[in-house]
Curated annotation (Swiss-Prot):
Disruption phenotype: Results in increased levels of H/ACA box and C/D box snoRNAs. One of its GO terms (cellular component) is nucleus. Disulfide bonds: none annotated. It comes from the Eukaryota. Component the THO subcomplex of the TREX complex, which operates in coupling transcription elongation to mRNA export. The THO complex is recruited to transcribed genes and moves along the gene with the elongating polymerase during transcription. THO is important for stabilizing nascent RNA in the RNA polymerase II elongation complex by preventing formation of DNA:RNA hybrids behind the elongating polymerase. The THO complex is also required to maintain TRAMP complex occupancy at sites of snoRNA transcription thus promoting exosome-mediated degradation of snoRNA precursors. Its main location: cytoplasm. GO terms for biological process: mRNA export from nucleus; mRNA processing; poly(A)+ mRNA export from nucleus; RNA splicing. Belongs to the THOC7 family. InterPro entries: THOC7/Mft1 (IPR008501). This is THO complex subunit tho7. Component of the THO and TREX complexes. The gene is tho7.
Amino acid sequence: MEETAIRSRLTVEERPLKRLISRCLGFAAQNVDEANLRDLEIEFSALSAFWLRLQMQLDMNAKEVDVYEGELKKTQTFCEAEKTEISQLEQDLLVAQEELRKREQYDELAKPIMSKGLRSRTEQQESIGKLQDAIRELEEENANYVKAWNLRKDIFDETLKQMNHLQSILHPPSNPESDSEEGIASEGENPSSSSSTQYKAK
């Protein structure tokens, strides 16, 4: 569309140049007089005006291109900003939906509690007192359990100690080297008895 418009402008503005070319070619076939020279000057003036208009048109087109490029950059920047804002809004929407879902869950959980109604201050103090008594009882039971456990551990350690002592008395540790030395000594004192014993065995 724009190319067609440009071509139509150039087609219209080509006329002064064509007239000048035609007149210059006509000078070769006829004599040049003052009237023809004035006509030629007029054609040159028209051509100069044509070039001036063409230059102005080119300058105007360049300005239009600059304006168009500026508008294009603004539009692109605006589109990028809009995309970023849309993405942020989508994230905010997801967060809001998640918060709404949690609130609905909290409301469902709170309905049974709220349906019972709020207790009076006296009832709350009584409940707190009962809880404190229960805590004290549990602490006392824990302390007694620790004492009993320590006592049983001491008794077990003492019993184990006594058993080890009794075992050392009933079964004293033997020394293999001393037993072998005693056997050799007894054989040295009675060699005949040892040999006779071997002979009988044979």
